[in-house]
């Protein structure tokens, strides 16, 4: 996804750094992200987690600025906790995605520099949503965001099936991000995978390095 912003009447266009993706399976969802954090050509961290659970059954992944993403994570967790305290049940996947859409839109004049995947499982089954920095909300079967997103998306489109299960989706996610890492300099160092099914969520880590000749 390409991010377009307006500052003082001037359009700025760029891809946000990193690679994150989401895949909907028949029995759950997978959200995965690589681990590299860069700034101005420097690698600041090789162990940055870009996928996070918000509730037992909803999580997010982000590409872009970590500080903005951390603000979003805190805000969503607070909203989810308040929802559960007031109504006595966990917030639905689309409900949390719509809250995030409103948060992002409220900052449209000074956008939070993140692209976000929201995924989870509720009574409507597995769901994946994608949001841009100004709050556009789209549901899809799979998404790939950030500077490595186009590469990862090509792998997913080639291998995705309507009947894919969560184990196969995890393997596909890791494979797609590995390919993105090979071509995108600001992505690298491993993959974190957030799996969400009817039973809840689990986090897994895959470590690998960019191959050199």
UniProtKB/Swiss-Prot annotation:
Mind telling me which InterPro entries this protein's record contains?
Answer: Ntn_hydrolases_N (IPR029055), Pept_T1A_Psome_bsu_arc (IPR019983), Pept_T1A_subB (IPR000243), Proteasome_bsu_CS (IPR016050), Proteasome_sua/b (IPR001353), Proteasome_suB-type (IPR023333)
Propeptide stretches are 1-18
Location, primary (coarse class): cytoplasm
SUPFAM superfamilies (UniProt xref):
N-terminal nucleophile aminohydrolases (Ntn hydrolases)
| PROSITE patterns for this protein | PROTEASOME_BETA_1, PROTEASOME_BETA_2
For this UniProt record, the keywords arranged alphabetically read as follows: Autocatalytic cleavage, Cytoplasm, Hydrolase, Protease, Proteasome, Threonine protease, Zymogen
Xref: PANTHER family: ATP-DEPENDENT PROTEASE SUBUNIT HSLV, METALLOPROTEASE TLDD
NCBIfam families in alphabetical order: arc_protsome_B
Cell location: Cytoplasm
Q: What class of enzyme is it?
A: hydrolase
Description of how the protein assembles with itself and partners: The 20S proteasome core is composed of 14 alpha and 14 beta subunits that assemble into four stacked heptameric rings, resulting in a barrel-shaped structure. The two inner rings, each composed of seven catalytic beta subunits, are sandwiched by two outer rings, each composed of seven alpha subunits. The catalytic chamber with the active sites is on the inside of the barrel. Has a gated structure, the ends of the cylinder being occluded by the N-termini of the alpha-subunits. Is capped at one or both ends by the proteasome regulatory ATPase, PAN.
- Gene field: psmB1
**What does the entry give for GO biological process?**
proteasomal protein catabolic process
Q: Give the protein family.
A: Belongs to the peptidase T1B family.
Regulation of this protein's activity per its record = The formation of the proteasomal ATPase PAN-20S proteasome complex, via the docking of the C-termini of PAN into the intersubunit pockets in the alpha-rings, triggers opening of the gate for substrate entry. Interconversion between the open-gate and close-gate conformations leads to a dynamic regulation of the 20S proteasome proteolysis activity.
Return the EC number.
3.4.25.1
Which residues participate directly in catalysis?
Answer: 19 (nucleophile)
Lineage: superkingdom: Archaea
This chain's protein is named: Proteasome subunit beta 1
Q: Which GO terms describe its cellular component?
A: cytoplasm; proteasome core complex, beta-subunit complex
Function field: Component of the proteasome core, a large protease complex with broad specificity involved in protein degradation.
* A GO molecular function held by the record: threonine-type endopeptidase activity
* Regions that span the bilayer: none
UniProt catalytic activity = Cleavage of peptide bonds with very broad specificity
């Amino acid at each position: 996804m390409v991010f377009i912003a307006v500052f003082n009447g001037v359009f700025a266009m760029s891809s946000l750094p990193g690679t994150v993706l989401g895949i909907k399976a028949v029995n759950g969802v997978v959200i995965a992200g690589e681990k590299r954090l860069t700034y101005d050509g420097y690698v600041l961290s090789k162990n940055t987690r870009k996928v996070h659970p918000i509730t037992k059954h909803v999580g997010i992944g982000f590409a872009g600025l970590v500080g903005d993403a951390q603000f979003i994570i805190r805000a969503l967790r607070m909203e989810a906790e308040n929802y559960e305290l007031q109504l006595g049940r966990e917030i639905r996947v689309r409900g949390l995605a719509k809250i995030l859409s409103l948060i992002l839109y409220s900052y449209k004049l000074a956008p939070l520099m993140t692209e976000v995947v929201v995924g989870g499982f509720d009574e409507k089954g597995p769901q994946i949503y994608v949001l841009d920095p100004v709050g556009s909300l789209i549901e899809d079967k799979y998404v790939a965001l950030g500077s490595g997103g186009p590469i990862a998306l090509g792998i997913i489109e080639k291998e995705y099936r309507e009947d894919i299960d969560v184990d196969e989706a995890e393997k596909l996610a890791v494979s797609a991000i590995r390919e993105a890492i090979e071509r995108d300099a600001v992505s690298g160092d491993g993959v974190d995978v957030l799996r969400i099914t009817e039973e809840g969520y689990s986090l897994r880590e895959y470590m690998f390095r960019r191959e050199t000749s």
